[in-house]
């Protein structure tokens, strides 16, 4: 059962602890509605002690956006969950900041989620990234040219703040769960338009690889990600130890304009290139 798989992921990565307050980013789409419903059910069925809030942002990009906002608000009202909504003009913000619409939307969402976290005194923010999102990210990193760090993909938990309970769940499982629970999530039709790189990877590249090379490409890249993560963790420990041995003086202050690190140059020059880069 999907809820059991999600609970296993939560337990494995220690995402949620007793007494946590969690802000869930909910768009109204299949992923976030699956996450919201699952966390409600997991809490009730397992008698877990955590509080849920919902944060929804209306980007003002599509005519369907207001309907999606009402859908999320109605669902939350039905389930007695406090829902925070913000409406913005992302296109306008993107132009003002001279960045892409996708980047502007992402920055806006995360800023809003943290705002609600502070307002509700919550300590976790749950994001509905799934296994397919992780695989797409890794492929995008490879296309752009990445080091081994880019092969790790999306982290299950970051800074002990952002948690991703669906990170081991495939999109097809999420869609089935939504159907079984009669959630009727809202579908963003722009996800099927091959305008952005991610959409092209999702709609064109992965189906082609599945058909022509490996039907289990999602599992294969997930395996690559897990191996890369273990290797990165080991390498980071190694680099930290070497750094300590090379360090002569360190003066780091977040408030200061000029920070200073002094290393033993002779020892530094004896290190392998991969250590120097790190």
Which stretches of residues belong to each language-model region?
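Core alpha/beta nucleotide-donor-binding catalytic domains of modification enzymes
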Residues: 1-26, 30-206
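ATP/NTP-dependent adenylation/nucleotidyl-transfer catalytic domains that generate, transfer
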Residues: 196-278
């Amino acid at each position: 059962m999907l809820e059991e798989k999600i609970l296993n992921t939560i337990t494995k990565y220690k995402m949620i602890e007793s007494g946590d307050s969690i802000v869930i980013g909910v768009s109204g789409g299949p992923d976030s509605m699956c996450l919201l419903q699952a966390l409600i059910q997991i809490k009730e069925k397992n008698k877990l002690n955590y509080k849920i809030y919902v944060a929804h942002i209306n980007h003002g990009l599509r005519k369907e956006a207001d309907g999606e906002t009402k859908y999320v608000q109605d669902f939350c009202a039905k389930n007695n969950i406090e829902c925070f909504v913000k409406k913005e003009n992302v296109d306008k913000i993107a132009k003002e900041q001279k960045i892409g619409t996708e980047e502007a939307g992402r920055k806006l969402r995360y800023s809003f989620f943290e705002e609600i976290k502070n307002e509700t005194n919550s300590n976790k923010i749950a994001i509905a990234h799934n296994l397919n999102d992780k695989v797409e990210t890794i492929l995008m990193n490879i296309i752009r040219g990445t080091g081994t760090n880019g092969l790790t993909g999306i982290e299950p938990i970051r800074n002990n703040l952002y948690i991703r309970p669906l990170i081991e769940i495939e999109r097809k499982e999420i869609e089935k769960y939504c159907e079984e629970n009669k959630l009727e999530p809202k579908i963003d039709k722009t996800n099927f338009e091959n305008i952005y790189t991610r959409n092209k990877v999702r709609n064109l590249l992965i189906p082609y690889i599945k058909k022509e090379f490996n039907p289990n490409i999602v599992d294969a890249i997930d395996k690559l990600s897990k191996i890369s993560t273990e290797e990165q963790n080991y390498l980071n420990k190694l680099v930290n130890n070497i750094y300590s041995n090379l360090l002569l003086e360190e003066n780091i202050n977040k408030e200061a304009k000029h920070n200073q690190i002094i290393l033993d140059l002779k020892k530094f020059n004896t290190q392998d290139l991969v250590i120097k880069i790190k």
